[in-house]
Regions:
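Non-catalytic terminal/accessory regions
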Residues: 1-247, 252, 259-598
Length: 598
């Protein structure tokens, strides 16, 4: 061990020492932190950065050592140490309870705690945007928030090396006029963007996201897209983490969009993790949170909203095909879009309404595409909703209400279908033989999969949809069915494909939009995060040929993804514990990926 430490302090190149540092204290888990922290005397930013990653969650084991070492450090390392102490202090439960009685208490606190090192991090920002901001609810138009208060808030965020909410700043900001503060943040943000959004100054995104208005959060969406196209991965990743911490409706909608539609797997995973953390903080599952943020675009349950031009009023209706119908309430004239404003109209109201409608079609299309993917996932994994949650998601929301009418739903108990029904536009429910259905108060509801329906009932549902010329939102009733044999249901391993010859290229190209895969040790690992299950399909080479072996399922930990999951999993879940519809869907994917039925 001593030889290892001697090498760490030797004259070898910095790059090799960093590799060795991480090997000893991360990979090998050595805990001689005095040896690690001694490297801080060398005043290397890279060394500090690597040490921070190692000790960030080890305050109890390292803080006393750092306090003793502090007087021996140079200025840069001392500044770094103070910032680390602040991060730890901010994480303590007591920090979240900080409150200020009045604005004088805010002024005194900022005067006491503002630091030169931190203010140096905002020296590049213009001061004018935040020099004439009033206190919240201030009646004296000549009394402004002292500049050092806002400099404190900005500088504390800009000096951070880790992303976190600063409780003291969160307690200060409510004392400041919200609209003026947000306008100042917008001006500072635009100043940074005009300077090519320099990565070294990216921490300005923290106060912008944390304290920005919903319209400011919404305008981050096109920026994230442009940054991703320009391969500015650092900015995209940071912004997604901040949106997860913000967790406002627009922030979560942006993350959900990227979770479902991101072309890049890295960005998709970043959005998913930020969204997952937001869900955890709210005490919800990812899917429950995704349900809650489905936008209604300002429409009521019937898909209607009123638009005011000042002198004229219009009723805008979202139609079942997601087109728009506009009724002039004065003339009783119907059109497909809002008219241009007249001289007698309030021009600002009219132009804002027209601008919103112009983007509505695209936003509705994006949202319906996202919901299509989510419903396809639910059909596959058998996700269920309690009655009240189902009504709130599919009936109260006008977009989802139109979607729900062409789908067949089921009441389930212990995973078994009890009754199937369809929602009608008049608000009632019907059965396959067109009898009225009453939804039980304690109903647990899921999309019906054909594997759960008797052949006669399945045929009745198909006939009913045809008779009413309803086109299902997803191909629900035509989903392929691959049933397990009674013998297979009793075991934990599927051997039906054992010995099947497949092309190696098919294995390495195996991937679907909602399933992530990894190939390791001659095993194809297929991970489904919705069920926290990994399917493991092993194969073997015999000369130039490749043959499948066995397929079995294992559970994965909450939050594990394709990068962090520890494979292989030795545990084998009973096939009877896996939703039959999920196995059926997976077998269909395998049948399409490989010519297994030939």
């Amino acid at each position: 061990k001593q030889a290892a430490y001697d090498y760490l302090y030797s004259d070898v190149a910095l790059k090799k020492r960093l590799i060795w540092l991480n090997k000893l204290f991360s990979d090998c888990g050595l805990k001689d932190y005095e040896q690690l922290l001694g490297l801080l005397k060398e005043n290397s930013k890279l060394i500090r950065r690597n040490i921070e990653k190692i000790i960030l969650d080890k305050e109890k084991k390292t803080r006393n050592l750092l306090e003793q070492l502090y007087p021996e450090l140079d200025e840069d390392s001392q500044n770094w140490t103070r910032q680390l102490f602040k991060y730890w202090d901010n994480a303590h439960a007591s920090a979240s309870k900080i409150k200020f009685r009045n604005k004088q208490a805010v002024i005194d606190y900022c005067s006491k705690h503002i630091e030169l090192y931190c203010t140096q991090q905002i020296a590049w920002l213009p001061q004018k945007p935040y020099t004439r901001i009033h206190w919240a609810n201030e009646t004296d138009v000549d009394e402004f928030v002292p500049r050092h208060v806002l400099r404190y808030v900005l500088s504390e965020h800009m000096a951070l090396t880790q992303i976190t909410r600063l409780h003291a700043c969160d307690a200060i900001v409510p004392f400041v006029d919200e609209k003026e503060w947000q306008a100042a943040l917008e001006e500072l943000f635009r100043y940074w963007l005009a300077d090519s959004a320099e990565a070294n100054r990216r921490m300005l995104l923290l106060p912008y996201c944390f304290y920005g208005a919903e319209w400011q959060i919404a305008q981050l969406a096109p920026l994230i897209k442009s940054w991703s196209k320009a391969s500015r991965k650092q900015l995209v990743g940071l912004t997604m983490k901040l949106l997860g911490l913000k967790a406002s409706p627009n922030a979560l909608i942006i993350l959900n969009d990227w979770m479902e539609t991101a072309p890049n797997g890295m960005y998709k995973r970043a959005a998913w993790e930020a969204f997952r953390q937001a869900a955890i903080r709210k005490g919800l599952s990812i899917e429950e949170l995704a349900d809650q943020i489905i936008p209604d675009f300002g429409f009521n349950r019937q898909g209607e909203k009123r638009v005011d031009y000042g002198t004229r009023t219009f009723r805008v209706t979202l139609m079942p095909d997601f087109s728009i119908s506009v009724l002039d309430l004065d003339k009783q004239k119907v059109s497909k879009s809002l008219p241009a404003p007249l001289k007698s109209d309030d021009r600002e109201k009219a132009e804002n309404a027209r601008a919103e409608q112009a983007s509505l079609k695209k936003r509705v299309k994006t949202q319906t595409n996202i919901q299509k993917k989510r419903l396809e996932q639910s059909l596959k994994n058998g996700r269920t909703w309690p009655k009240e949650a189902w009504l709130a998601t599919f009936i109260e929301n006008p977009v989802m209400r139109y979607i729900a009418t062409g789908l067949i739903w089921g009441v389930y108990k212990e995973g078994k279908l009890q009754d199937s029904f369809r929602y009608l536009e008049d608000g009632t429910f019907t059965t396959a033989d067109e009898k009225e259905f009453l939804l039980p108060d304690n109903a647990v509801i899921s999309l019906v999969h054909p594997i759960d329906l008797p052949d006669e009932t399945l045929a009745d549902w198909k006939e009913q949809l045809d008779d009413y010329e309803l086109i299902p939102f997803i191909p629900q009733l035509s989903a392929p069915v691959h049933r397990l044999t009674e013998t297979e249901k009793q075991g934990d391993t599927l051997l039906r494909y054992s010995g099947k010859k497949v092309y190696l290229s098919n294995i390495y190209e195996f991937e679907t939009a909602d399933i992530t895969t990894r190939i390791e040790n001659n095993t194809l690992h297929i991970i489904d995060r919705s069920l926290n299950v990994v399917a493991q399909l092993s194969f073997v080479y015999e000369e130039s040929d490749c043959f499948l072996k066995e397929l079995y399922f294992s559970s994965v930990e909450e939050g594990e993804d394709i990068n962090t999951i520890q494979l292989p999993k030795e545990e084998r879940l009973p096939l009877s514990s896996i939703p039959e519809r999920f196995i059926s869907t997976l077998l269909d994917i395998l049948n399409r990926a490989f010519p297994l039925n030939e």
